[in-house]
Amino acid sequence: MLDNFIVNQATKEFSVSEISNKIKELLENNFGYIKIKGEISGFKIASSGHAYFNLKENTAILACTCWRPTLAKIKFPLKDGMEVVISGKLSSYAGNSRYQLAVDNLQPAGLGTMLQILNERKTRLEKEGLFNKRRIPIPFLPTRIGVITSITGAVIKDIIHRIRERFPTHIIIWPVSVQGENSGNEIAAAIEGFNKLEEANKPSVIIVARGGGSIEDLWSFNDEILVRAAYNSKIPIISAVGHEVDYTLIDLAADKRAPTPTAAAEFAVPVRSILNNTLQSYEKVLLNNTKQLINYHEQNIANYDKIHRYLTNYINHRQQLLDETGFNLLDVLPCFIELQETKLKFCSKERINPAKIINYKTLELTHQTAYLSKSANNTLKNFEYKLELNSTLLASLDYHNVLKRGFAIVKGAMGNFLSSKITAADEKIFNIKFSDGEIKVVRN
C-alpha cells in the first residue's frame, strides 16, 4: 500500500495538513499493534494526567504517549532508565511532524529493572503489614481442597495424583493463566471467588501453584493485587510457585509456602495408611490403658471391701463394750451415790466453821514467819562471813602490810618506781621506802 501511494501520488500536490494526515493514516494502517523494547528517558506527566517519554536504544529514539487511563493500569512507577516492553500503535503528531507510539500496555523488561521493581514493591507492602498477618493453620483433614493453577500441564496432574495417593479428598480446580499480562488479576479473582462460595461448597484450604520458570515467567505472582487477595483470604493458602529456590511475593503473604506443587499436596493431606497405622497404635494403647485402669479400680474396690468388713467388726465390738459398760454403770451408780452420801454425812458442821479456819490459817502464818526469819538470819550470816574473808584478802594485798614483811619500795630521783636492775642502771640517787620510813641512797 505504501508503494502504491508513492507511485500514484508522485505528481500530486498536498497541503501540509493533508500530507501529515496521510502519513498518519499510512503509519496506523501498515504497522497496527506492535511491541517494542527499550529504555525510558525524559519521563514526565502533564497536568492532564497523560505521560510523555522517549523510548531509546543506543542513539535511536521513539516518542511515546501514555494516556491517563492506560497509565492508571500500570502496576509499578515509571522512571528514567527503566527497561520496558511496550505494546501499542504507531501514529504521527502533526504538530511537530514526528511519529510516536501510543502506549496500550507496558511491562518491565530486563532482570535489573524487574528486581528493582520487586524490591520497591516488597518494601512498600511490608510496611503496610501485608507480610506480617496472623497465619491461618492448615486443617489436618480438609473436606475440600481448592487448587488455583493452569488446567493444562504437569502441575495439576502432580497435585491430583499426590492427593489421591496420600488421602483421597474432594478437589475443586479453578483454572487460570499462570503467565502473562492478566495472569495476576485472574489468580486474585480466583482466591476471592473461593472465599465468596457458600460454606457447603467452600474449600478448607487453597493451593496456588505453578511450575518453575524465569523471573519473567513467575512475575504474575509478584502482582500487588494478588498479594492483597492472599492477605485478605479467610481460607488458608498454600503457595507453591516454581521450585524450592524460587521466591515470589505471594509466598510472603500466604499462610504456608511449599517448595514445589507436589510438596503443597503433601502439606494439604496426611498419608492415609500412616494415619490408619497411627490410629491402630493409639487404639491398642487406649485398650491396654483401659484394662489396666479397670484392674486397678477392681483391686481398689476389693481393698475397700476388706476395710469395710474390718471397720464393721471393729464398730460392732466397740458397741458391745459400750453396752457392757452401760450395764455396769447402771449396777454401780446407786452404790456410788450411796457411798458419797455417807461421806457427806460424816463431814461435821464444825469442820467448815469459819473460826476454826481462821485459827488454822493464823497458825500456818506463824510457822511461815518463823521460817522466813530463820532463813533471813542464815543468809545475813553467810554474807558477813564472805565480807570478812574478802576484807582479810584485801588487807593481805595492801603494800604497807607487804613492807612490814621485810620488803621495800625503790624509787629513782624523779620518783619513778624501779622494778628491775635494768631500770636502775642509769640512776645515781635512790629513795628506798620501808614500813617505818624512807632513806636516800647515793651511788658512788
From Swiss-Prot:
Main location: cytoplasm
Subcellular compartments: Cytoplasm
Entry annotated with the keyword Hydrolase: yes
Physiological role: Bidirectionally degrades single-stranded DNA into large acid-insoluble oligonucleotides, which are then degraded further into small acid-soluble oligonucleotides.
Source organism phylogeny: Bacteria, Pseudomonadati, Pseudomonadota, Alphaproteobacteria, Rickettsiales
Catalytic activity: Exonucleolytic cleavage in either 5'- to 3'- or 3'- to 5'-direction to yield nucleoside 5'-phosphates
UniProt gene name: xseA
Cystines in this chain: none
Source organism, top-level taxon: Bacteria
Family, as annotated: Belongs to the XseA family.
UniProt-listed PANTHER family: EXODEOXYRIBONUCLEASE 7 LARGE SUBUNIT
Pfam family, one: Exonuc_VII_L
GO cellular component, one term: exodeoxyribonuclease VII complex
Protein name: Exodeoxyribonuclease 7 large subunit
Native species: Rickettsia canadensis (strain McKiel)
GO MF terms, alphabetically ordered: exodeoxyribonuclease VII activity; nucleic acid binding
Protein EC: 3.1.11.6
Subunit field text: Heterooligomer composed of large and small subunits.
